[in-house]
Amino acid sequence: MEKRLKKTLARTSNCGANCTKLVLLVALFTPAFWSVDRISAPIEETTHSDDGNALVTAERPRPRQLVKAYSIVKSRRPEIADMEAWRISEVILEESSRHQLDPLLILAIIQIESNFQHAAVSPVGARGLMQIMPETGRYLADALHRECGLRPADFRPESLDDPSHNIRLGTYYLHGLRKQFQDLNLALIAYNLGPGEVQSRIENNLEFSAQFADIVLDTYQNYKESLTRF
């Protein structure tokens, strides 16, 4: 989808990711259902003694929200390796919690923008899962580094193809847009058209398309409604 993304005064707040206990959940929005055992299998953790010998292996249940996210990722892209799908799901939960966003909303954006194709490149050059333009990605990476007291990032457009990096930048970007426009619908429109374009049209009382925001919000609502049935 074509974009004209521009710089925004993105700012973020820091809060730790927090997940709840395990619930069994099957995958959605695909003809084939994933087995409950497969998507909710507990994580094995091994305790070691001081000399490095294994003492005991304990099972830790996967958090409910993590299983939800994983089920969506695998339903859209069943060929993704399980380890990669879990990692993508973990990053979505971590960054959504950090920026006070619903992980299902981030999943909806990824579905509409790239259908979970981490190497997707649009005709205008937007890249990765959340389809970020390289110039916007460079600005966001530098902004994140400054907030952490680090030197400017060594950014390359190809770095947007990394799923974890792309999700971090895209979630940070949406958080900044929501703070700027004080409205989720406008934030989504700005994510698609660019904040400068949206602000200009608002100031000049000009119309702009809300099609992207409508599609994302419809997908988001479908995720919420479908997941509550399990």
Residue ranges and their predicted role:
Residues 1-14:
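N-terminal Lys/Arg-rich, disordered targeting/topogenic segments
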Residues 18-34:
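Hydrophobic membrane-insertion alpha-helices, especially the h-region
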Residues 31-45:
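Membrane-interface motif at the C-terminal end of an N-terminal transmembrane signal
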Residues 41-43, 47-48, 52-230:
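Catalytic glycan-binding domains that act on GlcNAc-containing polysaccharides
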